[in-house]
Amino acid sequence: MTTVREIIQSPLFARQKKKLHKQQIKDLDRAIKFIFSAPTLGDMKVGDLQGIRIYKFKSNSQQILLAYEVVESTLFLYAFGSHENFYRELKKYLGGV
């Protein structure tokens, strides 16, 4: 099991987080703490998003998807959002990275 020592958020993740309300930020931070303590918690994706994990959590009774990747001891937070167009936008963003 990998021990995470550092968290890096993508510019997209930072922009998305700025738009949230206080309660949504608390829910997101709680989800990040879960991932930090157990990096293999999310579902591993295949195909174009191979290596990316998706963790699902609730915020204001809406399901939110959080895309992340663990490389060695670093947790990379890529994006989060509702299921609508999430994978398409994530694939487009990661293709440009």
What are these regions (language model features)?
Residues 2-6, 59-65, 69-97:
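Enriched for short, Lys/Arg-rich terminal
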Residues 2, 15, 39-44, 81:
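Residue-level signal for pocket-adjacent positions within structured domains
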Residues 1-31:
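Arg/Lys-rich, positively charged N-terminal/basic patches that mediate binding to nucleic acids
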Residues 33-60:
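A short, surface-exposed loop/turn module that caps and links secondary-structure elements
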Residues 16, 31-34, 89, 93:
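Residues that form generic nucleotide/phosphate-binding pockets
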